[in-house]
Amino acid sequence: MNLCGFEVGLDKPVFLIAGPCVIESREMAFETAGALKDICAEVGIPFIYKSSYDKANRSSGKSYRGMGMEKGLDILADVKKQLGVPVLTDVHSIEEIPAVAAVVDVLQTPAFLCRQTDFIHAVASCGRPVNIKKGQFLAPGDMKNVVDKAREANGGADNIMVCERGASFGYNNLVSDMRSLAIMRETGCPVVFDATHSVQLPGGQGTASGGQREFVPVLARAAVAVGVAGLFMETHPNPAQALSDGPNAWPLPRMKALLSTLKAIDELVKSRGLLETEA
């Protein structure tokens, strides 16, 4: 699959989707996008910048949601033009899709909406690549049904990715079953692993989600060792001050060290081949 000018797949270098959970300001958007661009160029990892103009599924109605679609898309458009990086953002309703698709390079669907048939049809038919997040409530094998819906809408175009972000495990907890990455390959789509939302503790702080940031490298290393096309990681210059998902965001100053390790694992695994394909 060609994505934003580079090839993705199990026989291609791992790529990265990264940025702050939500757009907090124009200055921070440019700071993080510029830093990530430089880091990924140095490490040798293709990069797509991610940030959201609206977080429609916050734990509390009083939590910061974002700058709104108009201001947020203006910032993403400027990041794309001035820094020369592809951009991704998520959409939460059918009505938003045309305006978002006119600006960004890749659209993303929230995990909670992965079974909404009309929504999946609309996103998939917009003409842009789509990263479909697997719901925390969904078995990995059931993503085939989601992908089938998307392909019905886009005429079978090769522009759909599927993303694992953990599975609900009791209350306020998620776990990552690494078998799901192999199972989701059966959709025929590139598989992306979300290493930061997978350590989230949904609603774990009462009016906000908690997280176990210390396990981001653990799960990221494991996923790359399994074999994935891409990684998704939310990052922030100072996660303690982040306006959304700070507890599970990976610190921007520590991103280079983590990506260097993941790059080495990815090269080793993909150079040896995947034995499970012969089992």
UniProtKB/Swiss-Prot annotation:
The gene is kdsA. This is 2-dehydro-3-deoxyphosphooctonate aldolase. NCBIfam families: KDO8P_synth (TIGR01362), PRK05198.1 (NF003543). It comes from Azoarcus sp. (strain BH72). SUPFAM superfamilies: Aldolase. HAMAP family: KDO8P_synth (MF_00056). GO terms for molecular function: 3-deoxy-8-phosphooctulonate synthase activity. Its main location: cytoplasm. PANTHER family: PHOSPHO-2-DEHYDRO-3-DEOXYHEPTONATE ALDOLASE (PTHR21057). Keywords: Cytoplasm, Lipopolysaccharide biosynthesis, Transferase. Belongs to the KdsA family.
